[in-house]
Regions:
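Short alpha-helical segments that sit at the start of domains
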Residues: 1-15
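A short alpha-helical element within helix-turn-helix/winged-helix DNA-binding domains
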Residues: 27-37
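Alpha-helical residues within the helix-turn-helix
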Residues: 35, 52-53
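Key DNA-contact positions within bacterial/archaeal DNA-binding proteins
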Residues: 42
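Short, hydrophobic-biased segments on the C-terminal half of alpha helices
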Residues: 48-49
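Beta-hairpin "wing" of winged helix-turn-helix
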Residues: 55-70
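C-terminal regulatory/oligomerization modules of transcriptional regulators
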Residues: 96-159
């Protein structure tokens, strides 16, 4: 099963909080974000640190400090958020190259296929912006279907 971690889900909430209009300077404290997102302040602080390390958030220390998006929400992709929190997007260990090669790698005829599938998923996630995640009905209208029928695949016509 493909599933994002709860921390990635929380990161999108935090980024959504940062995308909301804010006062002069646009800086938000971790405490404000924690209240807004209903997440614990330590969790928010940890996420802000990871998102800042990935260049998605700018942070400033001190009494007047806080954080803000490093770029507009429409210029931050879902793929970037996932990679900031979870690391490279990879369906199998052989795709991300982080682990030692498996014992079947020499004769594996699937690795090229997994690379193609992985790239397609990465590309799809790269086309979805944070702005789209924050306003899904504008960008992803509800899919209407008859009761008992499976939902159509986005981008495919249903006959």
């Amino acid at each position: 099963m493909l599933r994002l971690t709860r921390m990635t889900d929380y990161a999108i909430l935090v980024l959504g909080g940062l995308a909301a209009p804010c006062g002069a300077g646009g800086l938000r404290s971790s405490a404000d974000l924690a209240r807004q997102t209903m997440l614990g302040q330590p969790t928010v602080a940890k996420l802000v640190k990871q998102l800042a390390a990935a260049g998605l958030v700018e942070s400033q220390r001190g009494v007047q400090g806080g954080c803000r998006l490093a770029r507009p929400a429409d210029a931050i992709s879902l793929a970037e958020v996932i990679e900031a929190i979870e690391g490279p997007i990879a369906l199998t260990a052989c795709v991300d190259g982080a682990e030692e090669p498996c014992s079947a790698q020499q004769g594996c005829f699937m690795s090229g296929n997994w690379n193609s599938v992985n790239q397609a998923i990465h590309d799809a996630l790269g086309r979805v912006s944070l702005a789209e995640m924050l306003d899904p009905e504008r960008h992803f209208p509800p899919i209407e279907r008859e009761a008992g029928q499976p939902a159509p695949i986005i981008g495919k016509s249903v006959s």
